[in-house]
């Protein structure tokens, strides 16, 4: 579900706002969103690693993406109907949509793998996928621990390190494409698109980490 499809953090006039705190439901849903993002990352990594003989299908990846959309909608619906929230409303909305973006971009990269008829993934792509799995694992840990904030700061540090590593890897991957004078231009286009979709997933993970960092500071 792309940004904007989830709605707004503003409460529509027709929505009934509950004055009974349901703060624990936010933590449950964020934990579920993190788990779903990790499931997507692992599926996509396996699809790339085992391609073209992987038994992971694009339909399976899409199903996880759809499940993530449902969690995002549930979070925003809860946000729009609760007067009392565990932390800043804008941060809740941003975190929900950034986690959703992680899964969306992973699904896009997986889809391009099939659409472009890629015969064999490159080592760069497989390394990107491995970095994403590790980063999303830390994101899922942070989401699981939002309620008590235990271990969240270390997870954020680890994610930042992986994002820096991913940035360097993307530059190397693109350079390797343009360094070969005899490469088919179509191959350059295909892999540039796939590399950049994977990088967008990692960037969304970093943005989610930044939102969590703001939450930690505001609630210290």
Labelled PLM ranges:
Residues 2-220:
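Cytosolic, long alpha-helical scaffolding segments
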């Amino acid at each position: 579900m792309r940004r904007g499809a989830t709605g707004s953090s503003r409460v529509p006039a027709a929505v009934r706002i509950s004055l009974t705190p349901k703060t624990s439901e936010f933590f449950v849903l964020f934990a579920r969103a993190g788990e779903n993002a990790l499931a997507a990352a692992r599926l996509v990594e396996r699809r790339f690693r085992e391609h073209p003989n992987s038994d992971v299908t694009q339909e399976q990846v899409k199903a996880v993406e759809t499940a993530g959309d449902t969690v995002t909608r549930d979070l925003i619906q809860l946000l729009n109907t609760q007067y009392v929230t565990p932390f800043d409303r804008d941060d809740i909305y941003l975190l929900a949509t950034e986690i959703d973006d992680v899964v969306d971009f992973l699904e896009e990269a997986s889809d391009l793998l099939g659409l472009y008829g890629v015969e064999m993934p490159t080592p760069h792509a497989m390394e990107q996928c491995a970095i994403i799995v590790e980063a999303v694992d830390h994101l899922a840990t942070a989401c699981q621990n939002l309620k008590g904030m235990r271990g969240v700061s270390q997870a954020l540090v680890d994610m930042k390190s992986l994002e820096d590593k991913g940035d360097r890897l993307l530059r190397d991957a693109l350079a390797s494409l343009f360094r070969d004078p005899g490469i088919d231009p179509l191959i350059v286009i295909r892999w540039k698109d796939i590399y950049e979709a994977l990088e967008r997933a990692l960037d969304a993970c970093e943005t989610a980490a930044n939102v969590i960092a703001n939450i930690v500071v505001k609630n210290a």
